[in-house]
Amino acid sequence: AIVEVTPEGIGRNPGKLREIAEGSGVHIVSGIAFYDQSTYPDWVASASIGTIADYFVKHVEEGQEGVRAGVIGEVMSHNEAVANPSGYRLEPLEEKVFIAAAQAQRRTGVAISTHASLGRAGHAQLDTLERAGADLSRVVIGHCDAHWHEDIERDLSYYLPILERGAFCQFDMIGWEQLMP
């Protein structure tokens, strides 16, 4: 199976995924989420957390174009390179979407996949999801390899606390030569 988490606003296309899956025989799990704030649908800023959660739940339970989402993701918080990951904070609108993702996860049982590159935002994302009641054993922190260092201890100091909290680290930047030549 392939988990495909292109969010709304930057090319999510459930109908095309279905066509590819049927043509190839490969099971594709589609995600539902929003990317960065510049690509959020206009209604998100004024919507309640519950309304956003309902939107995610509807995509999981009913689907779009005959395809139900099997994961909430890729849920993103802004890319900000910070020297100390503990200094990273989600912006208020991002926090609202993360809380909605946690609520939708509790209602549906599906996993959450995040976008946490550059700023090493995984800890702040997990903090928000945990406060909102998410099951961290069903959370994947994406792009953990986006800031690979020669100093493995520095990297482990980021990865191990994520794993100790029960979440998963996703290493998915393989082949992106601009990042890791």
Regions found by a protein language model. Name each.
Residues R12-E19:
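Metal-dependent catalytic neighborhoods of phosphoester/phosphodiester hydrolases
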Residues E19-G23, H27-A111, A146-E150, R165-F168, ...:
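Active-site gating/metal-coordination segments in enzymes
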Residues V5, V75, G142:
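Conserved residues at the C-terminal ends of beta-strands
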